[in-house]
Amino acid sequence: MSSDEAVKWVKVATLDDIWEGDFLDVEVEGEEVIVVHLRGGEIRCFQGMCPHQEILLADGKVDFDAGIITCSAHEWQFSMEDGSGLNPRGCKLFRYDVRKAGEDILIGVPLDGRLRRLRHHFQQDA
């Protein structure tokens, strides 16, 4: 988790906006963010663009039974738990810190200049 000095907490939704087993796509300071309300009450927030070709993940498939977000373009898959790449492995989504304040859902936007939209580049053999 980030310290309060390293992030700016930004409200992205309320608990009434997103029920368990649902998701939202929102824009936060010019970046697309996908907010996922897992069954059981946990909330996860990730970059909202696929790291492959920057396709909006909310346009893909969000499968709560499998716990997987699938990009609509090339079917890259990511874990809803931590944003790690499942297909292909080795890629990942930027994961925002999340906090609840009453009914509000807040995400921690890094203040240290860290890139909040990760890209995956394939390395070619020489």
Model-derived regions, located:
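Tryptophan-centered short beta-strand motifs
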Residues: 6-9, 43
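Rieske [2Fe-2S] iron-sulfur-binding domain
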Residues: 22-125
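Basic/polar N-terminal segments that are highly enriched at the extreme N-terminus
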Residues: 1-4
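Short amphipathic
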Residues: 8-16
